[in-house]
Swiss-Prot record:
It catalyses: a (3R)-hydroxyacyl-[ACP] + UDP-N-acetyl-alpha-D-glucosamine = a UDP-3-O-[(3R)-3-hydroxyacyl]-N-acetyl-alpha-D-glucosamine + holo-[ACP]. NCBIfam families: lipid_A_lpxA, PRK05289.1. InterPro entries: Acetyltransf_C, Acetyltransf_C_sf, Hexapep, Lipid_A_LpxA, Trimer_LpxA-like_sf. The lineage of its organism: Bacteria, Pseudomonadati, Pseudomonadota, Alphaproteobacteria, Hyphomicrobiales. This is Acyl-[acyl-carrier-protein]--UDP-N-acetylglucosamine O-acyltransferase. The gene is lpxA.
Length: 274
């Protein structure tokens, strides 16, 4: 614990593990199973409970509550965890819950993520790296969020939804279906409004890759053939385009929800349905 500073008003329970150069601010409460890695900073009134791991050099602001029991009536009080990666910024009032013993039992957040004020990550979610939750963005239980996703302020995501990497959800949207990689969704209920072009450019995709994705998505939601045939056509036509295959593979994996589609498309479509 070399270089670690704990304010005299903070409560760090016996058993908690603190790394080096950790700062624990006034009135924080750290539970006995918490693990705080090197270089983390907790401002004032932060609560970290349960088997929660906070990755190195992460910063948590006032009144954030991490690792409390899941809001899941099926949870029976069993051993579950919350794991947060390194270099994460967790702003005021953010809440993240541990997994539930009726499911995978783990809530996982990747590295280099930003959670703005009052964002919420529910039980059994899996959030990738370099993800941004704007103010009041909320995801329900069992949601999967890919790398480099941005969720706009005041937006909510239904339980079991999958969000592909580099996707973008506009502010004050309600996403109830799976969103393809690179997709942009807006509205209540959110519809696919095109591709996240800015995100693709930031990811280093070349112009030809962006054009291929645009054409592939147009083919997928053309509605002239059964959806399964469209998926197979795109897979064959763009067999050498990794970015397109990312979208195809995401669709073929098929989660528990339907897909977020354009406004004119059937918003309950699944790959195994005509």
């Amino acid at each position: 614990m070399s270089g670690t500073k704990i304010h005299p008003t903070a409560l760090v329970e016996k058993g908690a593990q603190l790394g080096e150069n950790v700062f624990i601010g006034p009135f924080c409460h750290i539970g006995p199973e918490a693990v705080i890695d090197d270089g983390c900073s907790l401002m004032n009134h932060v609560v970290i409970m349960g088997k929660t791991t906070l990755g190195a050099k992460s910063k948590v602001f006032s009144h954030a509550v991490l690792g409390t029991d899941p809001q899941n009536n099926k949870h029976k009080g069993g051993y579950t965890t919350l794991s947060i990666g390194k270099n994460c910024t967790i702003r005021e009032g953010v809440t993240m819950h541990r997994g539930s013993d009726s499911s995978v039992g783990m809530t996982i957040v990747g590295d280099d993520c930003q959670f703005f004020c009052y964002a919420h990550v529910a039980h059994d979610c899996r959030v990738g790296s370099h993800v941004t939750f704007a103010n009041n963005a909320m995801i329900a239980g069992h949601v999967t969020v890919g790398d480099y996703v941005i969720i706009g302020g005041g937006s909510a995501v239904h339980q079991f939804v999958r969000i592909g990497h580099h996707a973008f959800i506009g502010g004050v949207s309600a996403l109830v279906g799976d969103l393809i990689p690179y997709g942009t969704a807006v509205g209540v209920q959110a519809k696919l409004a095109g591709l996240n072009i800015i995100g693709m450019k930031r990811a280093g995709l070349e112009r030809k890759d962006i054009h291929a994705l645009r054409h592939a998505v147009a083919m997928l939601f053309d509605h002239s053939k059964p959806f399964k045939e469209r998926v197979n056509d795109v897979s064959s036509f763009y067999s050498t385009s990794q970015s397109v295959l990312d979208v195809v593979n995401f669709i073929k994996e098929e989660g528990k929800r339907f897909y977020c589609t354009p406004k004119f498309e059937d918003d309950r479509i699944k790959v195994n349905k005509d």
